[in-house]
């Protein structure tokens, strides 16, 4: 197996065209060394969205072009690079994962203990027809449905805030209700 990055001595190219030029150079070297395309893991290199609004589109376009030229090549990425410097990074990371997988990415550097991200990967594979009859998804989560049905849903922070509003209303503490409602609204997203 071989991992190759689409960068050169000048750094990470801004354009898809320059990255693809590097990609074709990598393919020439792989051919010289007898490395089959199926053993290559190409990282098109995603940059942070906070400094480059085209971060996803350049990455996704590279993925699509690579998969068009060599469907058997694997595409990987350091997932959290896209969200560097942004607040609530997990939101950006999860959205990026889905969009990148749709463009052809089939592996990524992720936190294996992040259950939401792992669930997103299984669900996305099922939706993209990469999981025949959802067998992998069912195998991973089939028993979870029964377990979750038996467990009461945990209270969300919003539920707790609204309980406070309800209690203040019951107790007739009108002066405090406005602030409690505002706190609930501020923390609802």
Short names for language-model regions:
Residues 43-47:
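Active-site pocket-lining segment
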Residues 1-38, 48-69, 73, 80-189:
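ATP-dependent carboxylate/acyl-activation modules
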């Amino acid at each position: 197996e071989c991992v190759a990055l689409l960068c050169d001595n000048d750094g990470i190219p801004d354009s898809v065209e320059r990255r693809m030029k590097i990609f074709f150079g990598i393919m020439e070297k792989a051919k010289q060394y007898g490395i089959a395309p199926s053993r290559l893991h190409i990282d098109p290199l995603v940059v942070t969205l906070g400094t480059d609004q085209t971060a996803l589109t350049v990455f996704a376009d590279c993925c699509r072009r690579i998969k068009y030229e060599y469907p058997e090549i694997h595409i990987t990425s350091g997932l959290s690079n896209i969200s560097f410097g942004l607040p609530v990074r997990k939101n950006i990371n999860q959205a990026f994962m889905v969009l990148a997988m749709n463009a052809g990415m089939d592996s990524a550097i992720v936190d294996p203990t992040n259950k939401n991200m792992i669930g997103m990967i299984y669900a996305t594979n099922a939706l993209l027809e990469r999981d025949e009859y959802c067998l992998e998804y069912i195998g991973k989560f089939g028993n979870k449905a029964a377990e979750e049905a038996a467990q009461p849903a945990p209270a969300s922070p919003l539920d707790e805030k609204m309980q406070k509003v309800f209690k203040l209303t019951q107790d007739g503490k009108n002066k405090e209700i406005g602030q409690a409602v505002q706190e609930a609204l501020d923390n609802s997203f």
